[in-house]
């Protein structure tokens, strides 16, 4: 069963200038990401490269463009196990995703989440990680699986971080 998610809807200028623009206008709760207004849900479903924000070892924010996925009320972050961001996520499991409409930078969704668990591709049930990677490969490239960007020099293994959504902010219109 999907969890309730708090949504903060920022006021924007799509309908003209207004008092308090760019501040939070309305708040609501929805059940799962499927409960988002369609103008924001569309951003999640399109092959838009997100910006992932996380805290690096020096305490500064690290921003990484990457692919993402979601299922119900969980965000899925799939990365190679040998990458630095994998260790940073393990050290501080609080993440922020920003999904900006490439056709209108004043239309975006921000998702703050916390890693609940990780799935390892080399674990007995690791085929879940591979299937999810193949799914986003097709979403973002249009190519049939398998995922075609594995590092050929190493035996690259993947990690799937399953994240609970803490809150969502929305802004603008398409």
Which residues does each predicted region cover?
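Short, conserved active-site entrance elements at the starts or edges of catalytic domains
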Residues: 22-54
